[in-house]
Curated annotation (Swiss-Prot):
Protein name per Swiss-Prot or TrEMBL: Putative ankyrin repeat protein BB_B28
Keyword Iron among UniProt keywords: no
ANK repeat locations: 326-355, 359-389
InterPro entries on file: Ankyrin_rpt, Ankyrin_rpt-contain_sf
Phylogenetic classification of the source organism: Bacteria, Pseudomonadati, Spirochaetota, Spirochaetia, Spirochaetales
Keywords: ANK repeat, Plasmid, Repeat
Amino acid sequence: MSYYVLSKIFLYSGYLVIGFLSFTIFNKNLRNKIRDKLKNLYFLYYLTFFTLFIISSNLSYYFTEKQLLEDFNIFEKEFFEIHKINEQFFQKYLLNFPVPIRMELMSKFDPLYTVFNASFEKYAKNIGKSSYEIQTNYKNYIRTTNSEIKEKLEQIKENITPIYNKYKLPILNGENTEISIDENGNIIPVIKNTNGQITELLFYDQNYNLIPFKKFESYKVRFDLIPENKNINFKELINVYYLDEKNIITPIEYYKNNIDMSPYYIDLQENKDDFLKAIKIKKEYGLYIEKKKQLQNLTENDKLDDFKEFLLKNNNIFSLNTIFSNGNPIFTYAINVKAKSIINYLITKEFNINLTNQNSQTALHSAIIQKYDLNFIKSLIEKGANPNIRDGDNKLPIDYSDKTSEIYKYLIGI
């Protein structure tokens, strides 16, 4: 008899116990007969059924897990096929987000628990099974408490980690850039020629665009290859620096300090065949996220003085282009929560007014959706807001305005 059959026998036995116990509870005559017969031991009747139910449930669960363990090789094949499909959907989903939000999402990411329904549906269609059946079986394995199964899951999880970890690396035009690293494991995006030589370093500007890193302040950015170290698995290390007025080498720590867009590092000492398995999160990143929440709260409550003081104290990690964890840039979020004082302050400052949120909407989209008046819309246009940017639904800002409104007439005339 299979473990599956045994688990079902004990499962339905438990149902029968509960059914009979419920019948007793709701049948007054039967309750009275049992009470008269058992007298002071009446409680044992219910205790016996409760005990039988617990035993049946535990045995059902035990044999279910035994069956899962026996079928693990079959599940393992399904697991890899599902995640091959899932990575395609994951890429499409993740690349819609600005870099800081993508990095933050990856910091919370666990591949075992992040499988799209569409992945189950596509896999089920490929093999001619029910999507519900595939999904239920997958969840049964993920939720198991069996230590042997959990150990096996961790082993196969390690094999799929690289296909997801690559999204922690810099991405340009939908593809990972080439990378090098410094002696501390900080990830440095680079461009290489056809001979595999580094020709250019890249960095994220304040608008979250990946661009050539040629100037640091007023100095020319330079780099040297660090001689090979047998104790380091990642072979290509570089030293990034500039020469000051006295021709003294000064290290550039952009890649170390830019926690917003570069929160990960490669563990150079960890003995891994594939460096993608050795990507880790910088310890400062958790504090950065907490501070970003503080800034968001100040914006939401329109506390301008505290807002300005906070940015002044943390200007090395935050700017007016910072994007909050909810996917909104500071200015867009201020518009959404109608933080009037902060809006009036920000509009006098220099920042990228066309940064998009998690829905690919700009501040202009949000202002029209939130029904701000014509004067405010005009001030955004004068500030440089682009009325021709489409959001995730392929809509222009004007598409959210009433066609009889002054705002519509103004935007249509631009």
